Design a protein with these regions (language model features):
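Short S/T/G/P-rich N-terminal loop/turn motif that feeds into the first structured element of a domain
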Residues: 1-187
């Protein structure tokens, strides 16, 4: 969105460990073809290795519990930066997530939706964790957010008691490459 905190959007690469990520980045920045690619596309994106964030990501629910995401890999995302309230921790967040899943179980809605938590290492001033919502579209996100405000009840109260979440980063998103589906790739 126009109000994004990040000049370059949100680019996400997922690795099985920080060591694997660091090794891949070191290889990438030394590769001549990669350097040429970055130079050719710097009007689209700039890869700032020094600003890379380290987050552990986890889905806390079956990602297809509301149906599959669109076949073309596109979706709409909301990334909420959240800070724990005084005396609260990841254990409290897990309790809130359990209530959130119960609330989701009671919804009668159609359309793809998934969410996940990006847990930090405590070094990010903006967030202890990021709550990521992955919707089929911006329209379905608006409906979901309205449902949350109107009927979130105990789950909403628990989450708000656990953490303060700021306004979200909003993106029209897409999968470029998924190693679980190697034949699927954006060109």
């Amino acid at each position: 969105s126009e109000e994004s905190r990040f000049d370059n959007g949100w680019w996400e690469l997922q690795w099985s460990s920080k060591e694997d990520a660091d090794a891949a980045w070191a290889e990438w920045i030394q590769d001549e073809e990669a350097s040429a690619f970055m130079a050719d596309h710097e009007s689209v994106m700039v890869c700032d290795g020094d600003a890379r964030g380290v987050w552990d990501f986890a889905f806390h629910r079956d990602v297809e519990s509301f149906g599959p995401m669109p076949e073309d890999g596109s979706f709409f995302t909301e990334f909420f930066p959240c800070k724990y309230n005084d005396g609260k921790s990841s254990a409290d967040l897990i309790e809130s997530i359990a209530l959130y899943n119960e609330w989701l179980d009671g919804l009668d809605v159609a359309g793809a939706y998934a969410y996940g938590i990006y847990s930090g290492d405590g070094s990010d001033e903006l967030a202890d964790f990021w709550w990521g919502n992955f919707h089929e579209s911006s329209e379905s996100a608006a409906v979901g957010n309205e449902n949350w405000i109107e009927s979130g009840g105990q789950a909403r109260a628990s989450l708000e008691a656990t953490a303060a979440c700021d306004v979200p980063e909003l993106y029209n998103s897409g999968v470029i490459y998924d190693p679980a589906r190697p034949a699927f790739a954006k060109s």
